[in-house]
């Protein structure tokens, strides 16, 4: 994978997150926090997990190993979640714009929140981050339908089509 391909994926990720957040803006607080049969309990919980995972992988990429995820309290409201996820996406963008091919092929050592040490190739960590976020955006889209809201599509091909004249 080239640095330009990485940047394309992270531009896409920020675009898709913004579309996801736009889909949430019509929700009232009750529907945002309503318990649903889902991995993370609610739209808020799933969004908090998505953002916290992006943050912890960014920290690992930077050479840090936080021992816990961001608290869900940072995502108490849609406005708080919007600000925090946008901030994380800006930090991710700043990080990936400085990468070259040698960086992408290098390894990062880190320790998980469970205390397990790992070492991965940087580009694999970046791909995991993108894949993980896509997976949970899909979950949020499904949860939005459960609370009678309409999610915006966040497919990569839609982003790529929007770039073409």
Residue ranges and their predicted role:
Residues 101-113:
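Carboxylate-rich helix-loop segments that flank metal/cofactor sites and access channels
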